[in-house]
Amino acid sequence: MILQTKDLRFSYSKKGAPVLEDVSLSLHSGERLGLWAPSGRGKTTLCRLLAGYERPQKGEVLLDGKPLSAYAGPCPVQMVWQHPETVVDPLLPLGKTLAESGMPEQRLLDALHIREGWLTRYPGELSGGELQRFCLARALHPAVKFLLCDESTAMLDLVTQAQIWDFLLREAASRDLGLLVVSHSAALLERVCTRTITMPE
């Protein structure tokens, strides 16, 4: 499969300057594409467009030549955010949060070292690294084909970063997933990606 953007233009207001202008890229199944740029260049906005959270004013986001909206059921493009606490309901136990989109396979919970006792706990009772493991398990449902990692490990300690990337690279290889890895760290992108591009100014 291939995930593509063609000549994307996007701004957050009709009169505002565009955050993205004429942005085109392609990501193939099994590829690990790194995306580097300084802050404020529109990396997160691009991920939001690719995952269907926003719609461009111009251009298209296509999955195998079809608009993302044409795919029924769970979205085949998922995003893992930098701050996991912002994308989970603080009032729901984490087991219920996972079950909302279909309980992940037990092998994923085991591989991510998610303990059974954590399922009854609330987001505020877990560390950032523990919570990010939940978000990864939730994103990696069977229908997913492309995973967008937007600074997903930037706030974590080095040991947890290494554990998560080791898991992600193995999971992506076994399922032929396409990964888009957004990071300020050129060293990380060099280590985990098959190619890297820089966001234009």
Where are the language model's segments positioned?
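ABC ATPase NBD coupling module
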Residues: 66-78, 92, 96
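Conserved ABC ATPase "signature" region
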Residues: 105-117
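Conserved ABC ATPase signature
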Residues: 122-126, 130
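A short, flexible loop at the N-terminus of ABC-type nucleotide-binding domains that lies
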Residues: 1-5, 9-22, 29
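Q-loop/switch helix immediately C-terminal to the Walker
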Residues: 83, 90-105
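The feature captures the beta-strand-to-loop junction immediately N-terminal to the Walker
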Residues: 36-38
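Helix-to-loop junction immediately C-terminal to a conserved catalytic motif
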Residues: 51
